[in-house]
Regions:
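Class I SAM-dependent methyltransferase SAM/SAH-binding core
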Residues: 41, 48-90
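A short acidic, Gly/Pro-enriched loop at the edge of an enzyme's catalytic core
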Residues: 92-99
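SAM-dependent methyltransferase
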Residues: 134-202
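A short glycine-rich, Lys/Arg-flanked "PGG" loop and its adjoining helix->strand segment in the class I
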Residues: 117-129
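A short beta-strand submotif of the Rossmann-like class I SAM-dependent methyltransferase core
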Residues: 102-104
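Conserved class I S-adenosyl-L-methionine
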Residues: 1-35
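C-terminal lobe and adjacent flexible extensions of AdoMet/dcAdoMet transferase-like proteins
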Residues: 198-234
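Nucleotide donor/acceptor-binding cores
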Residues: 37-39
Length: 234
């Protein structure tokens, strides 16, 4: 789980561009395919950016995240949207949805494929018939290892980012924050790389039809660092 300090840094350093970009592409994809969505759920919703985008476009939305810090920010951002603090592996909402999303490499935080399968089975149950499950996972070939890279939040606060593999082959993001040149804190976020073909196989095992598995959601908006997967409940 992310620390409360990291959640604040995540929000203030402007990392919202990831769900913002995905939200624009998702809405365009829905329009292009003439798909009408009335309700949506965002798994691992973070600070609620995608939920806010969906709500502003007339879709009744909800969100959940394992991090209490992320959900606290989401509730402050959009108090009218229902948010749950929960474990995605066990999560069972009280109602069904037309669309379920899970972006920002959230599934790469799930270490075991057995837990991924549990998530897929649960999503299948709380999707409406004909509903869509759209998510992304890391594209291993396009992950840029290296650093440290620096980012200035303001005149006094600076972030340092290092991306590396550990001895298990997992991809790690080390975030270190300084204020006035003095160390404040650091956090390491670990992700495991999942084979997209294995992931698609698990979806099919759980009853989904896999409509798309590519490095983009829209043809004109390629996103080389992620695989985008679109699945439909039959």
């Amino acid at each position: 789980m992310y620390s409360d300090v990291f959640c604040k840094v995540y929000n203030e350093f402007g990392w919202n561009y990831v769900p913002e970009a995905f939200g624009e592409q998702l809405l365009a994809w829905l329009r292009k395919n003439e798909i009408t969505i009335k309700t949506s759920l965002d798994l691992a919703c973070g600070t609620g950016v995608l939920c806010e985008i969906m709500q502003k476009n007339g879709i009744m939305t909800a969100g959940m995240d394992f991090s209490e810090g992320m959900i606290a920010i989401a509730r402050e951002r959009t108090p009218e949207i229902p948010y749950d603090v929960a474990d995605m592996v066990q999560y069972q909402p009280e109602k069904n949805f037309d669309l379920v999303t899970c972006t920002g490499d959230a599934l790469n935080h799930i270490m075991e494929l057995t837990d991924i399968e549990k998530i897929f089975k649960n999503v299948y149950e709380y999707l409406n018939e004909g509903g869509y499950f759209i998510f992304d996972i890391l594209n291993e070939e396009e992950v840029s290892l290296g650093g440290p890279f620096t980012f200035d939040y303001n005149e006094t606060v600076q972030g340092e980012f290092l991306i590396f593999r550990d001895e298990k082959g997992h991809i790690n993001l080390k975030v270190t924050v300084y204020e006035n040149g003095e160390y404040q804190f650091e956090e390491i976020i670990t992700e495991v790389v999942h084979d997209p073909q294995v992931i698609c196989g698990l979806l099919q095992k759980c009853g989904f039809e896999v409509l798309k598995c590519a490095d983009h959601l829209l043809e004109e908006e390629r996103h080389g660092t992620a695989w985008f997967i679109v699945a439909k409940k039959l």
